[in-house]
Amino acid sequence: MKFTIIIPARYASTRLPRKPLLDILGKPMIQHVWERAKQAGGHRVIIATDHSEIAEVVTRFGGEVCLTSDKHSSGTERLAEVVSKMNISDDEIIVNVQGDEPLIPPCIIKQVAENLDNHQVNMATLAVKLTQRDELFNPNVVKVLSDKNGMALYFSRAAIPFARDNFPDCSDDFVTQNQYLRHIGIYAYRAGFIKQYVQWQPTALEQLESLEQLRALWNGEKIHLDIALETPEVGVDTQEDLERVRLILSNK
């Protein structure tokens, strides 16, 4: 199995300006992500960025970079531009790794690629089991349901499935026992499917939930879902997240 890893790295960030370039123990954050991705077994790792400063930094540490438009409204549109510019074949497996995940386990990057390769689907992703009530009711934590065949039924910021007789006053034990799932934002696709995906218009569901993957379900595509082999640490969205990542890495 051959797969390509693409890491989108946007320069602009509301809460953390120049986020991919923020220092973590002497290296820019995007380099930490790239180094993790290189360990996953893909034959190619490409960093897709909309800014020349990021491109220059990536080139200096030895990474492959694709300079993309700064007009994209979604990460998948950026992937589509990379697939086109780099002449990636339609049957190539593409794994999208977020550029703000400096602690992402390499094993789950390989896992999601293998899952796509082993199933007759165009898209695959991962989840982990929820253990805390607060996470279940946190709209920033995306929940997901799957069917008996491991195909995603729905993604939501709401607490799903809704336990009529137990919500909202349920315990952490209740959450654990009922195997609620938190979605992890890592995806594998066929390159040709990415081109198809960006031709579809945004749907009402994805706009309501602000969850781009719902466009695929709305259009009848199946998304394979599996439990991640390793639970990833938090991504970097805030200054507090950044400090936590610095602390974790300094203790390794």
Swiss-Prot record:
One of its GO terms (molecular function) is 3-deoxy-manno-octulosonate cytidylyltransferase activity. It catalyses: 3-deoxy-alpha-D-manno-oct-2-ulosonate + CTP = CMP-3-deoxy-beta-D-manno-octulosonate + diphosphate. Keywords: Cytoplasm, Lipopolysaccharide biosynthesis, Nucleotidyltransferase, Transferase. Belongs to the KdsB family. Its main location: cytoplasm. SUPFAM superfamilies: Nucleotide-diphospho-sugar transferases. This is 3-deoxy-manno-octulosonate cytidylyltransferase 2. It is an enzyme of class 2 (transferase). Activates KDO (a required 8-carbon sugar) for incorporation into bacterial lipopolysaccharide in Gram-negative bacteria. Its EC number is 2.7.7.38. Disulfide bonds: none annotated. Signal peptide: none annotated. The gene is kdsB2. NCBIfam families: kdsB, PRK05450.1-3, PRK05450.1-5, PRK13368.1. One of its GO terms (biological process) is CMP-keto-3-deoxy-D-manno-octulosonic acid biosynthetic process. One of its GO terms (cellular component) is cytosol. It is found in: Cytoplasm. Pathway: Nucleotide-sugar biosynthesis; CMP-3-deoxy-D-manno-octulosonate biosynthesis; CMP-3-deoxy-D-manno-octulosonate from 3-deoxy-D-manno-octulosonate and CTP: step 1/1; Bacterial outer membrane biogenesis; lipopolysaccharide biosynthesis.
